[in-house]
């Protein structure tokens, strides 16, 4: 499993904080950030890498998280969530089988961002009654 991470200019500093944290937790990271990229391009790059392997997960950071979330929801088969708290990050994995989260550097601080990332990457999909909803999401687009 790889954690694919990317950020636009507004999210660069926080991306480095999250990246360093996850590397210290022994996760394999793929950073697709390229200088001058818009959040649209960053999100598409993260999604492309996430979709290479079923186990891969993605994190996109910009100013507010909303833009990358909108982009991610346009990608067929991508279940994503905009999160700004640890519980939502964990629950979107366990109930929605989300493969990507977005967050805003102007909304969350360093410690919260680390906890959000930790909750997301450590979350496990519960399946069961949630699979009906996930199947519905995967048919969309």
From Swiss-Prot:
Q: Which GO terms describe its biological process?
A: D-allose catabolic process; galactose catabolic process; lactose catabolic process via tagatose-6-phosphate; pentose-phosphate shunt, non-oxidative branch
Give the UniProt keywords, A-Z. Answer: Isomerase, Lactose metabolism
GO MF annotation terms: galactose-6-phosphate isomerase activity; ribose-5-phosphate isomerase activity
What is an example of a Pfam family matching this protein?
Answer: LacAB_rpiB
Catalytic activity reported: aldehydo-D-galactose 6-phosphate = keto-D-tagatose 6-phosphate
Q: Which superkingdom does the taxonomy of this entry point to?
A: Bacteria
Q: In which pathway does it act?
A: Carbohydrate metabolism; D-galactose 6-phosphate degradation; D-tagatose 6-phosphate from D-galactose 6-phosphate: step 1/1
InterPro entries associated with the record: LacA, RpiB_LacA_LacB, RpiB_LacA_LacB_sf
Q: EC number(s) in its UniProt entry?
A: 5.3.1.26
Asked if ATP-binding is a keyword of the record, the answer is: no
According to the record's subunit comment, the protein's assembly and interactions are:
Heteromultimeric protein consisting of LacA and LacB.
Q: State the similarity comment.
A: Belongs to the LacAB/RpiB family.
**Protein's name according to its UniProt entry:** Galactose-6-phosphate isomerase subunit LacA
What is the native source organism of this protein?
Streptococcus pneumoniae (strain Taiwan19F-14)
């Amino acid at each position: 499993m790889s954690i694919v991470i990317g950020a636009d200019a507004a999210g660069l500093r926080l991306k480095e904080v999250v990246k360093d944290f996850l590397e210290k937790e022994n996760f394999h990271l793929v950073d697709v950030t390229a200088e001058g990229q818009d959040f649209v391009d960053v999100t598409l790059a993260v999604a492309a890498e996430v979709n290479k392997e079923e186990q891969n997960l993605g994190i996109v950071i910009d100013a507010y998280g909303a833009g990358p979330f909108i982009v991610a929801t346009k990608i067929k088969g991508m279940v994503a969530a905009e999160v700004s708290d640890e519980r939502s990050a964990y629950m979107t994995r366990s109930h929605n089988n989300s493969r990507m989260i977005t967050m805003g550097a102007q909304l969350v601080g360093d410690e919260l961002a680390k906890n959000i990332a930790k909750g997301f990457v450590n979350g496990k999909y519960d399946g069961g009654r949630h699979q009906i909803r996930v199947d519905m999401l995967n048919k969309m687009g």
